[in-house]
Design a protein with these regions (language model features):
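Positively charged, small/polar-rich N-terminal and surface patches that mediate targeting and assembly
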Residues: 2-132
Length: 132
């Protein structure tokens, strides 16, 4: 599905040896102020295995309002991102199970997940399409 001019250009280039993943998923995994790093690393490994690769941004900071005290808290968060071509029901269950295990091990009440398009394009095709 072409959403805008950038999507049109990227999908055109992807036809010449690139890849277009119709979806990407991002998981925002708090590190419990670095006390549950093992749980976050395990989640990252599971996502990498399930999706065939992932990117992690380790320098993010997440904030939330403590509902009891009304105070804004912040802590380090790993943003784990992976592209995919639609999961099978079994793969989707495996992903949900990985999220559940992380949440349990890290003692998280909530885990943020988002989804959208993601392109992987060959540089050579990009260079040919946009010669200066």
């Amino acid at each position: 599905m072409i959403e805008d001019e950038l999507d049109r250009i990227l999908s055109d280039i992807a036809r010449y040896g690139g890849m277009c993943f119709p979806s990407k998923v991002k998981v925002y995994a708090p590190t419990c102020n670095n006390t549950c790093i093992q749980a976050v690393e395990k989640l990252y490994r599971r996502i990498t295995e399930l999706f065939g690769g992932a990117t992690v941004y380790k320098g993010a900071i997440g904030t939330f309002v403590d509902p009891v005290r009304g105070v804004v808290e912040e802590e380090p968060v790993w943003v784990i991102e992976a592209a995919h071509n639609c999961l099978t029901p079994a793969e989707a269950r495996s992903f949900a199970e990985a999220l559940r295990e992380y949440a349990e091990e890290a003692r998280q009440n909530y885990i943020a997940v988002s989804q959208g398009s993601f392109y992987v394009l060959p540089s050579e095709s990009l260079a040919k399409r946009f010669k200066t």
